[in-house]
Amino acid sequence: FLLWDKAHGEVMRTVVFGRGIAILAGSSAKPRDRILTFNARPGEAHYGVLQNKYLLERAEIRDFKSTFTINDDGTFSYASDLLLKLAATRAEMHHTDNNTLHRVKHYHPRAEYA
């Protein structure tokens, strides 16, 4: 979910994964910004990361960064980076995801948006 806090000029993204991870990420933003950034770190009082004990012991989340971009051609792009510390190798690993979404059809009852 995306949330907008107009009074504080902040945009927030909430993400929950069924395996036991919850992320509340956010940053400052203005109403017409076309690039939105979302950051979260474990242990922060706001914009933090929680995970269950099982995952924490095997793949500890160290950082989360994500960017949403509203492109001029009407597409929507995103990129996410979840930094993990793997217990098995003691190494850090970036779990990344990015994509560009294209609108297939407008679903709005008003004709000017059809």
Regions flagged by a language model, labelled:
Residues F1-Y113:
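Soluble ligand-binding/transfer domains with enclosed cavities or grooves
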